[in-house]
A protein has these predicted regions:
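Conserved N-terminal phosphate-binding loop of PLP-dependent enzymes in the Aspartate aminotransferase
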Residues: 1-282
Length: 282
């Protein structure tokens, strides 16, 4: 059944999948349902799910309490384009949970969150360049997709196209403090450094001892905002994410679908001192 569905999909969906990471030979397994830690494929095989939405489905598939809440909300409507009490409650909860968080902007996707976090940093600092680490994945938009550790975007012509769009993106090796120190000597117009506290898209690469502390110190000394991309690490390393686990206080943090156990939900969090930029940029 999965093989047949893949052949049908290739006729209408580029590559037969809606994300390059879902494509593998000879064909991907198509899923019909999931419950708890297991999924059932369209081939009627029950499998233990080690992926769990790339970590977003923290509580398991079809978690009863969340499903019940969703069903209740569906009867009340789904899109108002107006504020709700629930978003205020979520912002308040995140401010209590995430270190160094005084303001929160709620969104729907991880890419949207990191994009707005970078825009916030550029607005607040009035600088235009960003620093990311080789292999770090921060979303599917051009500014950060270069050297993202995904095979689908690592070869020409995609890299050639991204190069022009990402000309203000500076890429250095992860865990390489010397490279960062040399970079800030050369470039005085760096708005922010964005980092996955634990590099996930090219394998789980743990930061060397004192690495995160040092990049916090270097960014502070050079007027560069530090962004923790916690799309993967948020609520997993600890309830307060990598920021709490490592004891580092970034200026801005981003969180993804783990906020909603896999539902489209994301957030940007940070300090209240950037309030004017919060309002004008995101």
């Amino acid at each position: 059944m999965s093989e047949t569905l893949f052949e049908r999909a290739k006729l209408r969906i580029p590559g037969g999948v809606n994300s390059p990471v879902r494509s593998y030979d000879p064909y991907p397994l198509f899923v019909s349902s999931g419950k708890g830690s297991k999924i059932v494929t369209c081939d009627h095989d029950t499998l233990l799910d080690y992926c769990m939405g790339y970590g977003a489905v923290l509580l398991g598939h079809a978690y009863a309490e969340i499903i019940d809440s969703i069903k209740l909300q569906l009867d009340k409507g789904t899109l108002y384009c107006m504020p709700t009490e629930q978003e205020v409650e979520l912002a308040e909860l995140l401010c209590k949970t995430i270190p160094n968080t005084e303001m929160v902007r709620i969104m729907t996707t991880g890419s949207e969150a990191t994009m707005h976090a970078i825009r916030l940093a550029k607005s607040f600092t009035s600088k235009k360049k960003i620093v990311k680490f080789d292999g770090g994945y921060h979303g599917s938009y051009d500014d950060v997709l270069v050297n993202a550790g995904s095979g689908a975007t690592e070869s020409s012509p995609v890299e050639d196209i991204l190069f022009e769009s990402a000309k203000n993106t500076l890429v250095i090796p992860y865990n390489d403090l010397t490279a960062l120190e040399e970079l800030v000597k050369i470039h005085s117009d760096i708005a922010c450094l964005i980092v996955e506290p634990i590099l996930a898209n090219m394998g789980l690469i743990i930061p060397k001892q004192d690495f995160l502390n040092r990049i916090r110190r270097i960014t502070e000394e050079n007027g560069i905002l530090l962004i923790f991309d916690e799309i993967v690490t948020g609520f997993r390393l600890s309830i307060g994410g990598a920021s709490e686990y490592f004891g580092i206080r970034p200026d801005i943090s981003t969180f993804g679908k783990a906020l909603g156990n896999g539902f489209p939900l994301s957030a940007v969090s940070g300090r209240k001192g950037m309030s004017n930029s919060w309002i004008s940029s995101i």
